[in-house]
């Protein structure tokens, strides 16, 4: 956890310092909130079906892998058990084929991340299952197909929750035609973030919402080191044990914990829940970066209009002290209220009209 936190801070600092000037151009034109909501909403049905299918396949696979009671050839033949585990893993990999291809191409582009770690574990587990099926050996137990398959299923579940969160967020943005924005400003107070509410457009909100979450950011920095550590530890374990026939089983074991299930869904699930609850109040947050800015803010600007909205304020009466000129008092008071931008302006005007 400490290494992950350090990696996240270092990567965040590097991104802030070495941000590309043409980053906005690389993202392309920002879609409208309506189009973004339709796009992510359209992905939900497919992802929900694929996620459920993957989870259903994982249930018997986990049951077998835990060594729980089985019957028939599954109990008597290690070859059959290894082949069954392999077929179930390949089925889940086929259901989550985009996860596998993304992981592979990220490795080819030398930008490994969480999905690359899942891909590597799937490869080693599948090869290990093939070797165990061919040799018929039960000396090391069953392959780690359940871990690999469940990792792919968690990736699908994470994508499903992310799409749901974006659907709620962008639908709320599309409904409100004149929203108030709460933004994080780093120029109000030096070296710190200040949160303030204002009337401004929401340009850039969608692109900012779609930026990588904490797990992707952390593991983009950690993945190369985890891959290197897995190779070194796998080779050391094989050499020290002297059992070179089980090298694939060792590599499957050391790569299995590199992409923990919690990391795959650490942000997506709470983001979906928060986005749904915020949408019920007509609010939305710009993904992980919006939540991070609010969490790291140290100052908050609150105005009269935030505390005392116009619909909740009324003036009972005006009392002018003896010796004062009523016309001047009313004129000066009205000028001060209007100049201050206070929500008392409309209330004071209504009172003057009623008393005339």
State where each predicted segment sits.
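Short beta-strand-to-loop capping motifs
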Residues: 1, 19, 320-322
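Short amphipathic alpha-helices in soluble, non-transmembrane regions
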Residues: 2-7
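Residue-level detector of short coil/turn "hinge" positions at structural boundaries
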Residues: 10-12, 282
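Structural motif at membrane-water interfaces of alpha-helical integral membrane proteins
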Residues: 12-220
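Glycine-rich, histidine-containing beta strand-loop boundary motifs that form or position
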Residues: 14, 266-267, 312
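Signature of the cytosolic headpiece of P-type E1-E2 ATPases
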Residues: 58, 81, 134, 344-348, ...
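Hydrophobic alpha-helical transmembrane segments
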Residues: 89-99, 148-174, 186-303, 329-344, ...
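Conserved beta-strand/loop elements of the cytosolic catalytic core of P-type E1-E2 ATPases, chiefly
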Residues: 238, 308-328, 336-339, 356
